[in-house]
C-alpha cells in the first residue's frame, strides 16, 4: 500500500527515531513560543535548556544535532537570542572549533603509528593487570596532547581489527579472507566460549582506555574541548593550566590507576577476564605475518609519523600557535610525507569530527540564550555568597551532577561564562576566578564518566560499530564505569576541598605561578561583553 505524502513527511522527520521521540520534539517546538510570549522568557529559557539536555540524554535514539538544532533555530526565530549573539559565541570559541576540525583530522593521518603502538602493547604484555594499566596510561598520555575522541577512535580501530581476526578463524576461515564479523552464524561450537571471553576481555580494555582519556584529558588545556574554552577565558597557557589543575588531577590520576588495578585483580563490575590462549596464538601469528610483509615504505611512514608526533607535543607545550592551527600543520606534514594527496582521501579524515563540531555550534546557540535570558545568574549569585571552599565545592558538585546527564562541553561553557561575567563585573576577585575555573574544569571532566551522555568519547564508543560486536550496551557501560565514577568524583571533590587552596598558595610561593593581574583580566573582558 502506497504511503501518503503526509505520512511520508512524518516518517522522514528525524529518520529512525521512535515515534514517541518525534512527538516529544514536536511538542517542545509547539510549546516553547507560547511559554516565551505568554508566560515568562526566563521560564521559557530554562525549559529550552531542559529540552536540550533531554536531546543529549537521548543521543542513542537520535543524534542531538537535529532535534537540538531545531530547538536552537526556533529560539533565535522567536527572539530568545539573536544571530549576532550566536555568532559572537562562535567567534569567541573559534579555537575549540579549530581543534575539532583540524586536530582530529590531523591525528587521523597518524593512525598507522598509533595502531602499531597499541598492537605491540596488546600482544607483548601477558599480565591482564599490566595490560589494563598500559591501555589506561597510553590513552591518558595521548589524551593529554590530543583530543579524547581521536584517541578512542584509534582504540576502536585496533579493537575491531583484532576482533575480526579471531572471528574469522572461529568461523573456520583464513584471517586474510573477507568475512562478515557482525554475525555469529558460522562460529564453530568449540570456539564460542573463547569468543565470549574474548568479547569480555576487549570490553574491559576499551573501558580502561575510555577512563584513561578522562584521566589524561582533564590535565591539559587540549585534552577536552571545554578545557580549551576555560583556559581561553582565564588567559592560561599550556604549562600554567597543568600546574593549576595538578592539586586535583594528580591525586585523581593515581587513584584512577589504583582503581584500574583493583577492578582487574578482584574481577569487579565485569572486569578481570583474561585473553584466551587460543585467541592469543592466532593474534601473534597474524602479527608475525604482518611484520614479514611490512616494507621500507611502511617503516618510512611510521618514522615520519613519529617525528610529527614529537613536533605536535613540542608545538603544544610551547604554545607556538592556536591548537587547531598546530593540528593543521600535522595534516600538512603527515599527508606530505606519507603520500596522501588525493582530495577524496583527505576528506575521510574530517568525517569523524565534523558532526560533533556542528553540534558544538548548536551548544553555543543555547549558551547565547542562557546569556541573553540571564538563566544562571540567580544560581551563580547564590553560590558566590558562600565563603571560602564552599564556593569551589558547590561549583564542582553542580558541574558534576549536570555533566552526568548532559554533555560536559555544554556544562563547562555555561558555567565558565557566568563566572567570567562575575569577574568582569567586579563581583569576584581574579584569584577567586582562578580557583572557580579549576573547580569547573574538574567538575565537568571527572564525574561525567558516569554515563555516555557526559563524555563525547564514551558516546562515540557506544554509537560505534564495535559496541554491538563486543556486546557493550548502555547499561553495561554505566555498570562498568561505576567503580571509576565513585573514585574519580570523590577524590576530585576531596582535592577541591582540601588541596586546591594550600597547593596553589605553595605554587605562588615557589614562583611556579604568579597572581594574574588586570592585564590578564583584560584579555577575557572582551569575550564577556554581551
From Swiss-Prot:
Alphabetical list of Pfam families matching this protein: NhaB
GO cellular component: plasma membrane
GO MF annotations in UniProt: sodium:proton antiporter activity
Keywords assigned by UniProt, alphabetized: Antiport, Cell inner membrane, Cell membrane, Ion transport, Membrane, Sodium, Sodium transport, Transmembrane, Transmembrane helix, Transport
Localisation: Cell inner membrane
Membrane association type: Multi-pass membrane protein
Primary localization class, coarse: membrane
Record field: transmembrane: 13-33, 34-54, 64-84, 90-110, 113-133, 136-156, 205-225, 234-254, 306-326, 351-371, 378-400, 450-470, 481-501
Reactions catalysed according to its record: 2 Na(+)(in) + 3 H(+)(out) = 2 Na(+)(out) + 3 H(+)(in)
Family named by the database record: Belongs to the NhaB Na(+)/H(+) (TC 2.A.34) antiporter family.
Function: Na(+)/H(+) antiporter that extrudes sodium in exchange for external protons.
Protein name per its UniProtKB record: Na(+)/H(+) antiporter NhaB
Native species: Photobacterium profundum (strain SS9)
Gene transcribed to yield this protein: nhaB
Amino acid at each position: 500500500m502506497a504511503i501518503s505524502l503526509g505520512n511520508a513527511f512524518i516518517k522522514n522527520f528525524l529518520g529512525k527515531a521512535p515515534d514517541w521521540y518525534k512527538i516529544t520534539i514536536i511538542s517542545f517546538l509547539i510549546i516553547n513560543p507560547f511559554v516565551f510570549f505568554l508566560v515568562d522568557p526566563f521560564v521559557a529559557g530554562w525549559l529550552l535548556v531542559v529540552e536540550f539536555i533531554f536531546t543529549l540524554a537521548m543521543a542513542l535514539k537520535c543524534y542531538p544535532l537535529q532535534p537540538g538544532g531545531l530547538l536552537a533555530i526556533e529560539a533565535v526565530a522567536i527572539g530568545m537570542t539573536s544571530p549576532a549573539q550566536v555568532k559572537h559565541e562562535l567567534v569567541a570559541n573559534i579555537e575549540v572549533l579549530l581543534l575539532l576540525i583540524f586536530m582530529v583530522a590531523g591525528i587521523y593521518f597518524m593512525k598507522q603509528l598509533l595502531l602499531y603502538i597499541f598492537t605491540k602493547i596488546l600482544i607483548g604484555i601477558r599480565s591482564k593487570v599490566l595490560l589494563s594499566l598500559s591501555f589506561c596510561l597510553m590513552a591518558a598520555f595521548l589524551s593529554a596532547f590530543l583530543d579524547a575522541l581521536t584517541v578512542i577512535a584509534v582504540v576502536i580501530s585496533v579493537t575491531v581489527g583484532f576482533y575480526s581476526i579471531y572471528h574469522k578463524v572461529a568461523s573456520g576461515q583464513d584471517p586474510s579472507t573477507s568475512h562478515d564479523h557482525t554475525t555469529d552464524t558460522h562460529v564453530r561450537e568449540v570456539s564460542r566460549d573463547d569468543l565470549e571471553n574474548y568479547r569480555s576481555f576487549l570490553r574491559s580494555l576499551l573501558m580502561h582506555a575510555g577512563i584513561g582519556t578522562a584521566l589524561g584529558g582533564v590535565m591539559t588545556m587540549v585534552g577536552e574541548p571545554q578545557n580549551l574554552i576555560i583556559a581561553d577565558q582565564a588567559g592560561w597557557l599550556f604549562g600554567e593550566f597543568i600546574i593549576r589543575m595538578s592539586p586535583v588531577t594528580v591525586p585523581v590520576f593515581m587513584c584512577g590507576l589504583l582503581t584500574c588495578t583493583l577492578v582487574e585483580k578482584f574481577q569487579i563490575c565485569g572486569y578481570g577476564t583474561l585473553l584466551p590462549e587460543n585467541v592469543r596464538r592466532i593474534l601473534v601469528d597474524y602479527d608475525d605475518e604482518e611484520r614479514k610483509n611490512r616494507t621500507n615504505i611502511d617503516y618510512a611512514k611510521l618514522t615520519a609519523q613519529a617525528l610529527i608526533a614529537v613536533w605536535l607535543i613540542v608545538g603544544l607545550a610551547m604554545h607556538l600557535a592556536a591548537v587547531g592551527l598546530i593540528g593543521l600543520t600535522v595534516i600538512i606534514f603527515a599527508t606530505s610525507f606519507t603520500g596522501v594527496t588525493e582530495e577524496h582521501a583527505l576528506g575521510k579524515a574530517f568525517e569523524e569530527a565534523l558532526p560533533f563540531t556542528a553540534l558544538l555550534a548548536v551548544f553555543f546557540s543555547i549558551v547565547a540564550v542562557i546569556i541573553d535570558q540571564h538563566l544562571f545568574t540567580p544560581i551563580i549569585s547564590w553560590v558566590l555568597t558562600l565563603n571560602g571552599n564552599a564556593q569551589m565545592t558547590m561549583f564542582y558538585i553542580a558541574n558534576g551532577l549536570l555533566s552526568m546527564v548532559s554533555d560536559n562541553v555544554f556544562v563547562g561553557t555555561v558555567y565558565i561564562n557566568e563566572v567570567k561575567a562575575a569577574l568582569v563585573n567586579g563581583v569576584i576577585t581574579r584569584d577567586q576566578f582562578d580557583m572557580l575555573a579549576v573547580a569547573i574544569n574538574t567538575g565537568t571532566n571527572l564525574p561525567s564518566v558516569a554515563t555516555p551522555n557526559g563524555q563525547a568519547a564514551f558516546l562515540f564508543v557506544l554509537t560505534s560499530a564495535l559496541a554491538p560486536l563486543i556486546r557493550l550496551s548502555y547499561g553495561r557501560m554505566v555498570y562498568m564505569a561505576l567503580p571509576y565514577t565513585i573514585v574519580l568524583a570523590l577524590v576530585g571533590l576531596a582535592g577541591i576541598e582540601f588541596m586546591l587552596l594550600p597547593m596553589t598558595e605553595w605554587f605562588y610561593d615557589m614562583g611556579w605561578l604568579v597572581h594574574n593581574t588586570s592585564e590578564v583580566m583584560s584579555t577575557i573582558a572582551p569575550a564577556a561583553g554581551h
